[in-house]
Amino acid sequence: MPYLLLFALLFALNAPLARAASCPQWSPQQAKAEVAQLRATLARWDEHYHRQGIALVADELYDQSRERLNHLQQCFAVGTSPSPLASARGPVPHPVPHTGVDKLADRQAVARWMAGKSGVWVQPKVDGVAVSLTYQQGRLVQLTSRGDGVNGHDWSRHIPQLDAVTRQLPEALDLHLQGELYLRLSDHVQAKAGSANARGTVAGLLARKQLTGAQGNAIGLFVWGWPHGPEQQAERLAQLARLGFPDSQLYSIAIDTLEDAAHWREHWYRSALPFATDGVILRQSSRPPAERWQAKAPYWIAAWKYPYAQALAEVRDVRFRVGRTGRVTPVLHLLPVTLDDRRITQVSLGSLARWHTLDIRPGDQVAISLAGLTIPRLEQVVHRTVERQAVAAPAPDRYHAHSCWQASEGCDEQFIARLTWLGGKQGLALPRTGPGTWRRLVEAGLVTSMTDWLQLDAERLQQAPGISRLTAAHLLGSFDEARSRPFDQWLRALGVPIGKHLPLTGDWQALASRSAGHWQTVPGIGAKRSRQLVEFFAASEVQAIAAQLAETGIEGFRPPPQRIEQ
């Protein structure tokens, strides 16, 4: 027992340290400012959504921003925010409060929630707007927005236009239902189309004073709650179907295991449905009497949401990658996030101009998606950090097509990119000459120009860290192969600006003497490309490389032999 107590005490003492490790390293002043700014942003989003029906940000980005605020408030003990539903509160009380729903983060959380529970059902989590519906003598007479779960706004003015909603029951019953008004879609596949802004569209329509017939007909209803209905879910669903709500039964499945829940979650995520969804709802068949329901998450219902289509990621650093042609590509290095089971740690911005426009700094929060389900893509800047860190960006004219032909300060990226192209399949196609090899040779000072490597021997190659005797032998074999490559392959390896299918006939002297007009006589070469070719052959750095290759004896670069007069 003493050992168990000691272990428990050590765990308790270390738990806050583990949590603190994921907290930002901010001063108290910055923490207060960052939290205040995030609270203000969320309050503005809430106000627009609940009062005007306007979603200023995607639902999943809102959810992640709310989670981030909760995390920061715990990190820095700066109090809690008002309920996000505070601005949604209206003057009309619900007959029975709308409960909240706990969100289960992963399979392990779902397994814990299901443990010990029986009679569990799974339904799609329809992505719409929650409402209460009141029927008197079988006629729909009251439609109330969820509001804060206790009081909402009266939307009854829209009832005449909601043709897709059951407005008259087959029996003259008085009953109260809870459900989701959703945007009616045709064969909507959530995994492919995402949320399609369905929730925001419906919220915007219902915030209007009046709907047209077409607008009303675009709204459907999914009933998920009958507070005073039969005790067991199967009977509730059967009676709802008889009353004119068949979808509730069609999209409700009794399950026994975690695997069942995972199966239906995946099935509905990738199947065509008449509405957008953002996960599944798990609920027990039996629940407490409606008189005990409260506007908070109960134990008998939970949500298992789908993977985010957009992840909110924090920028750790902004770096600038320089390519072979001098193109500068800003790259955001991120705190790792997961999208569709892929770990994302960086995203390209494409161009220096785009980075200047967006002005992204370390600490900013950005939205990331996957283009084509594989390539990380920046969607937008969601939150900007209060304290703007300086970023050392290269001057727009620092790098270009003829910069960095040699190793020098600030040139490693472009120079190594040139060498990588030279040895790659689009160049000389030299085995075992990837970017890592060239970087080792450059950093060891063994290669400082585009032709130094032709003069290296095994002893000098082994001076570079990571290059063994065997590797050196392989590299020497590759370098020897380069000497026999044809002239046009050497030119393409050096990056001559011409398409790979266009011919390069003649030797160095013949091509270097061509004018722009001469180049334009070649089919497929226009005015712009001809100017680039003239600039390439006239560049002093390229001419120096050609001279070095001529001295080395590479075909096509050697001047023709002088004729001796008799």
Swiss-Prot record:
SMART domains: LIGANc. The keyword GTP-binding does not apply. Its EC number is 6.5.1.2. One of its GO terms (biological process) is DNA replication. Keywords: DNA damage, DNA repair, DNA replication, Ligase, NAD. It is an enzyme of class 6 (ligase). The active site is at residue 125. It comes from the Bacteria. InterPro entries: DNA_ligase, DNA_ligase_B, DNA_ligase_CS, DNAligase_adenylation, DNAligase_N, NA-bd_OB-fold, NAD_dep_DNA_ligaseB, NAD_DNA_ligase_OB. It catalyses: NAD(+) + (deoxyribonucleotide)n-3'-hydroxyl + 5'-phospho-(deoxyribonucleotide)m = (deoxyribonucleotide)n+m + AMP + beta-nicotinamide D-nucleotide. One of its GO terms (molecular function) is DNA ligase (NAD+) activity. The keyword DNA damage applies. Catalyzes the formation of phosphodiester linkages between 5'-phosphoryl and 3'-hydroxyl groups in double-stranded DNA using NAD as a coenzyme and as the energy source for the reaction. Belongs to the NAD-dependent DNA ligase family. LigB subfamily. This is DNA ligase B. The lineage of its organism: Bacteria, Pseudomonadati, Pseudomonadota, Gammaproteobacteria, Pseudomonadales.
